Every structure is written in C-alpha cells, then in structure tokens.
C-alpha cells in the first residue's frame, strides 16, 4: 500500500477512488503540502529541480541544432538567405500519398520537410555559424551541458552536497553572484564572442579555435584599450554598401554607435550590438559588487529596506519588514521573478520586430509574425502566474504583525480604492471603445461611412515625432531639423536612427491613425480588465467583507459548502482562472492588430488596414475571413497543397477549444452519472470485463474540471490562431 502513487501524500495514496491519481498529479509540484516536508528539504528540492529544468532546455536546443545539421539546408540557406526556405527537419511519414510528398518537398530537399519559422537560421548565421559541422559541434556541446546539469542536480540531492537554508537565504551573495556572474560575465563573454567570431564572420573571415589566437578582431589589437584611445574601436565601420558575410564594403570597427539598420540585412549593426553588450556587462559587473558580504562593505538589503520610510509619513512605515517577508517567502520571490520575466518577454516581442537583431530576419515575414505572437502569449501566461503566486503568498506566507503599516499592509488596507479604480477604468475603456466601434459599424451598414467617428491619435503621433518621425509635420525635438538634438543626432550619436525612423521599409514607429487609436484602447480595456481580476484575486485572497475567513480555506476552494451562500467562485484560484480568459482575449486583439497592420504593410496596401480597422465588420471580414481563405483551402477537390497541415491544425484547434466548454459548462453530477453508467456497461461486456481497476471511477472536482476546461480552451485557442497566422502569412509571402 505504501508504494502507491502519490508517495508524497499517505492520505491520497489510501484514497480508494480515481481522485488519488488526479489530486496526486495536481499536487505533485506543491512541495509545501507534501508529507514530512521541512523548510530545508523544500529549498533543496526546488534547487535540484532547477538543474533538471536546465538539462531539458539544453537537450531541446541541442535537438534543434542536431536536426537542422542532419536534415536541414543551412549551408545552402547561407548562400542565399532571402530566397532559400530554411528547413527545420524532415517529415518521416507524410500521410495522403504522393500529393502530400510533392507538396511538402521544398527548400531544395529530396523529401518532405517542415519549414522553420523560428528564426534559428538567422540567429545562427548572425552569430557566426556557417557550416553543418558548426551546428553539430554546438549540438554536442549543449548535450554535454545537459549531462553536466543532470549530474549537478543529482549531486545537490546527496547529503554532502545539499546546501543549507541559510545559503538559500543569503540575499546579498545571491544578488552579487547573479548580477556579476550571471548577467555581467555572460554579457562580457557574449561581447567577446561577437567581437572575435561573429563580426569577423560578417566580414567574410572564418574564426574557429584553430585560428582564434592568430586573427586580430581589430587591426590595432588591445593597444587602444590600454592607451585610453577607445574611440579608435569605433572608427571605420562597415559601409552602407557592405554585403553581409563578405569583405565587400566591410570596415574594421568593433564597437560603434551607428544606430539604424544594415541596409542589406535590415538588422541592427553587429558592432552596435557588441557595444551594447559591453555596456551591459560593465553595468552589471559594477552592480554585482554593491552588496555587503564577506568584507563588511557595501549595502545590506535589510538596512536599505528598513531605511525606506517616506519623510511625509504618507506611506506609513514604508518598506520596514519587507526584507524578512520577501526573503522567507518563495511565493513572493517567484511572483516578483515572474512579473519581471513576463514584462521582459513582452518587450522581447515588441523589440524583435521593430529592432531586429538577426540578419535577414526582417524579410522573413512569417518568422516575424510567429515570433511576435509566440512571445506575447508566453508573456501573458507568465504575467498571470505572477499574480497567482502573489495570491498564494498572501494566503500562506503573509504575516500581518511583521508588516504592520508598511507598503504591503497599506495595499491591503486600501484595496477597495485600488479595485474600484481599476473597475472604473475598465468600464470607461470598454463602453467608450465598443461604443465607437459599434457606431462606426452602423454608419458603414447604412451606407454613410463619412459619419464615422474617427479620432486621430495626436498624442502618440507627437511622441513618434519627438523621436524623429517627420511625416506628421509636428516639427518637435528630433523631427525639428533646426534643433540641437537633430544636429547632434546627425553626427555625435546614432546617425542612422533618423534615416531608419523615416524609412517605410521597417517596422519602427509605424504610421498610425484612427484604426490604431481604437484598437489601442480595446487592448487597454483588455489589459485593465485582466489586471482588475488578478489584483482583486490577490488582494481579496486573505478575506473580504463577504468571506472574512477566506484564507483558512486555502488557495483553491470551490465553495464553503451548501449552507453558506455566495462563497462559490471567490477563491484566489478562481480569479486566476477567470483572468486567463481575459489574458487570452487581450493577446488575441494584440496579435490580430500586429498581424493585420503588418500584412497590409508588407503587401503595400496599408489603406486596407486604415479604412477597415475602424469598425468591427472590417476586422471580421477584411482580416479574419479574408485571410482564412487559403487556410480553408488546404484540402480541396483538386488535391492538396503545403498549407494542408495548417488547415488540419486550424480544424483541430477549433475542436480542442470547443472541447474545453464541455468541462466548463457541465459539472460533477452529470459526469458522475455518466461514469457510473459506463462502468456498469463495462462490467457486463464480455472480454472487456476481464479488465478491472482498483480505483473507483469518480468525476473530477469542480476546480479540476475548470482547470481541464481552461487548458483545452487555451491550447485550442492558440493552436487555431497559430495555424491561421502561419498559413495566411506564408501563403502570401512564402
């Protein structure tokens, strides 16, 4: 009996129903709730599992390199990045016979293949990889790192190598090591790689270990560094006629401030990127020496936070008590980490397309669309997770005595004001934005488009103008040709920036109008509503006027029994659950907007977006319906084409999405009756009744069914849009 799953909970292991399996899976990673857990074991388990996570990541990236080297066309892509389609891997068994084999044999391959829309070819090319041998070497190195990570994870579970709790709670040492070691040293190492390998490769020079010490990355070597003539490293940059990967038009500079894009690759100058990483390395190496550890000098985090008491007394005791609260709560730390990572991931999405760092990626439209969408969805899930763990912190880890009258306590004290303000903002945005869209819809329907309410986003246009965009005629700051900022920008810093901002061949500061104004406010509505639900869930997690003892019921409870009305749907988990729907909804609008604006830009018919995006029917007809036509045509009476797999995924995504509602709408009683009927039939069916199981089948709990429904809804939603996005973009641009 003792060895039944789950071993971490004897209570669950003895459960005679299938609840044992589902609750076991649900709580497998909730180490805090396991039998015999101690604080020390909790920290050690999490620490060891991080190594496992790293091993999986290294194995996965190794697999990417290996499959491209084995089955891809990297070497022929390198010869002509704009016209050869990059291959991700082969397709072993193309269904549907010869037509499928022909449809999927592309990119110069001998058999059916998948095309890569991840941007890895452009990335590897930019950082100096050129041959399949390079890719195999990288794959083997990452495989080695994966093995090392697994060994390290195992090692740190052995008694002699288990770190103590005090080691995990040494905030200053952790800050120093993460800032200097993780960010500082790795940024410096990356600068080294760019300067010694990638920049020479972009100029046609092949640097590897065998000639690494013979090839000077700069004609004067380390001379300028030691003599203080650092500006020499910026002299003679690549010319505007430079052909990437060759010596033609190449310069000798290694650290520059050119600004703008390389004319041929439409990506940031590699020498600018190296300079950026060197600056980051310097900042973080300094930052990693600021906190007090062995030598009694530097900042103490506790002293810093305790000293943060606003002089006017308007924020009470400020940050007093926060050090111990944060340092003793893994959920608080995880919440902060997820919030930061979520914002960074969304920023990655925004910057990867507007300031592309990888050569030729800007001309690979499907990859641009896929990467933007991918990073925005990831950001959404991570950000909602931040609030979930914030709520768990309030339930499990928050100590009111320790935080008396500090900023945390005051957040809880005036939560009504916070929640009602967010509610007001959401209602205002929602009614006004929908009102404008619906008004415009009606005007179009009645044949009077001139009666639409079209609002120019003048403040946003003014901000774009301040950054140098001249087409609006605002004549302010960088767009004022007579101003000192403009003149300095021409010579001292980033001379390429102003050209880039005013060129129409990139995605920097796209021209905006009334359609952008409306969808911007629709997205603002989504963001504020998602935030409202998440913030309310966290701030009410300990209790509310309706249910003052809520924290005693834990993070996820369905209701407090039948005798206490109004306690259903108000657990902190329910808030997270509802917020994920709004998050998906919002990112849907974000990605629709990005994609439609860009396909009209790439096709040269921006007027279609400008004219159709001001009313709802325009979005439905001219974006969704018009662009799904290729998708619905993946299979037709005349055979099939290379979009057929996306057509299938589009259908399959809808199916998964719709299945979600089956779990979301019907509750336990329905399923319990169905299960008992099926079990009855099973026991009376010859042959089938030879198979028996020990656990009595029971329906999922309310909370579990919601999770399963939410998972299907999310996965189906993303599958459907991914298929639409990739098929509609690749169908147009290849």
Swiss-Prot record:
GO BP annotations listed: photosynthesis
GO molecular function: 4 iron, 4 sulfur cluster binding; chlorophyll binding; electron transfer activity; magnesium ion binding; oxidoreductase activity
Reaction it catalyzes: reduced [plastocyanin] + hnu + oxidized [2Fe-2S]-[ferredoxin] = oxidized [plastocyanin] + reduced [2Fe-2S]-[ferredoxin]
Transmembrane segments: 46-69, 135-158, 175-199, 273-291, 330-353, 369-395, 417-439, 517-535, 575-596, 643-665, 707-727
Keywords: 4Fe-4S, Chlorophyll, Chloroplast, Chromophore, Electron transport, Iron, Iron-sulfur, Magnesium, Membrane, Metal-binding, Oxidoreductase, Photosynthesis, Photosystem I, Plastid, Thylakoid, Transmembrane, Transmembrane helix, Transport
Residues annotated for phylloquinone binding in this entry: 671
E.C. number: 1.97.1.12
Positions bound to chlorophyll a B1: 654
Topology versus the membrane: Multi-pass membrane protein
SUPFAM superfamilies from the UniProt entry: Photosystem I subunits PsaA/PsaB
UniProt feature coiled coil, ranges: none
InterPro entries: PSI_PsaA/B, PSI_PsaA/B_CS, PSI_PsaA/B_sf, PSI_PsaB
Residue sites binding [4Fe-4S] cluster per the record: 559, 568
Compartment(s): Plastid, Chloroplast thylakoid membrane
Cofactor binding comment, as recorded: P700 is a chlorophyll a/chlorophyll a' dimer, A0 is one or more chlorophyll a, A1 is one or both phylloquinones and FX is a shared 4Fe-4S iron-sulfur center.
List of residues binding chlorophyll a B3: 662, 670
Record GO cellular component, one term: chloroplast thylakoid membrane
Family in the record: Belongs to the PsaA/PsaB family.
HAMAP family tied to this protein: PSI_PsaB (MF_00482)
Subunit composition and interactions: The PsaA/B heterodimer binds the P700 chlorophyll special pair and subsequent electron acceptors. PSI consists of a core antenna complex that captures photons, and an electron transfer chain that converts photonic excitation into a charge separation. The eukaryotic PSI reaction center is composed of at least 11 subunits.
Protein name: Photosystem I P700 chlorophyll a apoprotein A2
Organism of origin: Solanum lycopersicum
Gene (UniProt): psaB
